[in-house]
């Protein structure tokens, strides 16, 4: 009986201690000084035991601007969030340069001050102009070690408007 009461108490504690965090992020992506148009920008909530959770997603407009708002729930703490960008501006060579475009992933940790408790953001994290050709990723926790050992890379079909890289 005592074990059942203890188990139920622990389950209720995890539900009661669940915390919600909200954020608003905006900025402009540039690639070599030119607005990076039509690129996906996402905000994720960092999870320790499971895959990170998508909070919000947007695509840059004709001037490279994006604006993301969203909230996420964590079981025990105010959620830690980060901006995630597939950085095709900092192109990496690929075995199929005429058909594939590859680039490093970019993670930018949001300061705790810009993740408000509750479902509504209280302030905006303004990234201003982010020059992707020189941007570097920020990793949290054990991911720092993983990033040191192996770099995350994303690939996509080369857009028809983008010429293949010059032969080197």
Summary of predicted features, one role per range:
Residues 2-35, 52, 135-168:
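Beta-strand-rich domain onsets/edges
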Residues 11-129, 162-163:
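Beta-strand-dominated extracellular/periplasmic modules and repeats
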């Amino acid at each position: 009986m005592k074990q059942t009461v203890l188990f139920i108490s622990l389950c209720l504690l995890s539900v009661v201690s669940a915390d919600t965090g909200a954020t608003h992020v905006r900025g402009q992506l540039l690639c070599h000084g030119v607005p990076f148009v039509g690129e996906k920008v996402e905000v994720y909530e960092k999870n320790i035991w499971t895959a990170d959770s998508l909070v919000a997603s947007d695509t840059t407009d004709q001037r490279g601007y994006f604006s993301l708002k969203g909230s996420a729930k964590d079981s025990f703490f105010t959620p830690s969030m980060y901006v995630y960008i597939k950085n095709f501006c900092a192109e990496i060579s690929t075995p199929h340069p005429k058909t594939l475009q590859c680039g490093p992933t970019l993670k930018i940790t949001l300061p705790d001050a810009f993740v408000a408790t509750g479902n509504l953001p209280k302030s905006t994290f303004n990234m201003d102009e982010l020059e992707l050709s020189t941007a570097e990723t920020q990793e949290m926790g054990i991911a720092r070690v993983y990033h040191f050992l192996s770099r995350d890379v994303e690939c996509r079909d080369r857009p028809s408007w983008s010429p293949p890289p010059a032969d080197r």
